[in-house]
Amino acid sequence: MVDHARAARMAKRIQTIVASAIERQIKDRRLELVTITDARVTGDLHDATVFYTVRGTDIGTEPDYDQAAEALTRAKGQLRKIVGDELSVRFTPTLSFELDTVPEASAHMEELLARARARDAELAKLKEGAQPAGDANPYKTSDEEED
């Protein structure tokens, strides 16, 4: 029987443990710009997926995703040992790391929304001085035409 609440608690705990281990215990310069964003554990509590993002060294520089992935792969065993020591469970889940694409997707959505707002403002500006193509009241009645 799957206990989703227990899996969620364990995932949150794994996220915290891995993030602090990368910050304090793992000595790899390639992991300095890695941020752990989320963790998910399967229902049987045997596999954990840890999601991460990578920042660039400067605002304008592109992050090195390949180096971060390689560093996480190399530190996977050490991180699993640390997670096993911190968790009080019979079986330590295996760790797999995935690049979190949510920040890039949300930035893209923000860009699309900003473009839509700019187009709406442009259309509103054009609409202010617009006149109807025909008469102002195209639905005249016959009584009005005789006057």
Swiss-Prot record:
One of its GO terms (molecular function) is ribosomal small subunit binding. Its main location: cytoplasm. GO terms for biological process: maturation of SSU-rRNA. Residues 123-147 are annotated as: Disordered. Keywords: Cytoplasm, Ribosome biogenesis. Signal peptide: none annotated. The keyword Cytoplasm applies. PROSITE patterns: RBFA (PS01319). It is found in: Cytoplasm. InterPro entries: KH_dom-like_a/b (IPR015946), RbfA (IPR000238), RbfA_dom_sf (IPR023799), Ribosome-bd_factorA_CS (IPR020053). GO terms for cellular component: cytosol. Belongs to the RbfA family. Monomer. Binds 30S ribosomal subunits, but not 50S ribosomal subunits or 70S ribosomes. One of several proteins that assist in the late maturation steps of the functional core of the 30S ribosomal subunit. Associates with free 30S ribosomal subunits (but not with 30S subunits that are part of 70S ribosomes or polysomes). Required for efficient processing of 16S rRNA. May interact with the 5'-terminal helix region of 16S rRNA. This is Ribosome-binding factor A.
